[in-house]
Design a protein with these regions (language model features):
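Active-site helix of classical SDR
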Residues: 69, 111, 119
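Alpha-helical segment proximal to the catalytic Tyr-Lys
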Residues: 74, 123-125
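Conserved mid-core segment of classical short-chain dehydrogenase/reductases
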Residues: 14, 37-55, 74, 78-84, ...
């Protein structure tokens, strides 16, 4: 089932969640993956970083994540607890840039650091409702967008990986999400999925 929505606004997300409820009878798992970036230094060659661009990235990556999380949690709270006493699991997506933002990533890095900072608080807020919250902070993954990147972009990123010395596969992100759902003792954690890489300044 595919439902188009705008995570930055309340009504479209409520409508999307209600469609899920109508078809499946409820909601037990929510994985927040929507997001984007904006390359730009705080002081560019001709002008400061556009404020509206910074606000858009924060609104999409951080506020949008919070918006989906709160609306999903409201529906999860109506579930009957499962055999573990759990009503739902929310998995948010951050980035290693939330820890080591590169030059020109101020908006993206700030938005993902916000998601990381939100994780434990959200888990504590929702504990009384038997809803767990975890975050995955992926490194560099071999996505269609990355496959289009030139070698001068890909090679330095690949050099930052440790073992395995390669880009991550989307299936590995999915595997971790499934593990978080299945492991009822994981809560309030941000898990780096990056083969031990640490981002260089550029």
């Amino acid at each position: 089932m595919f439902v188009s929505t705008n995570i930055m606004e309340e009504e479209p997300v409520v409508n999307a969640v209600n469609q899920i409820k109508d078809k499946f009878g409820g909601l037990h798992i929510a994985v927040n993956c929507a997001g984007t970036g904006y390359p730009g230094r705080i002081l560019g060659k001709e002008a400061p970083h556009p404020l509206d661009a910074f606000q858009f990235i924060i609104n999409l990556n951080l506020v949008g994540t919070f918006n989906v999380m709160r609306i999903a949690a409201e529906l999860m709270d109506k579930n009957e607890p499962d055999e573990k006493g759990e009503k739902g699991v929310i998995i948010n997506t951050a980035s290693v840039a939330g820890y080591e933002g590169q030059i020109g990533q101020s908006a993206y890095s700030a938005s993902k650091a916000g998601v990381i900072g939100l994780t434990l608080t959200a888990a504590r807020d929702l504990a009384r409702h038997a809803v767990r919250v975890c975050t995955i902070a992926p490194g560099i993954f071999d996505t269609p967008l990355m496959q289009l990147a030139p070698d001068k972009v890909r090679d330095p990123l690949l050099e930052s990986t440790q073992f395995p010395h390669r880009f991550g596969q989307p299936s590995e992100f999915a595997d971790l999400a499934v593990h978080i759902v299945e492991n009822a003792y994981l809560n309030g954690e941000t898990i780096r999925l990056d083969s031990g890489m640490r981002m260089k300044p550029r």
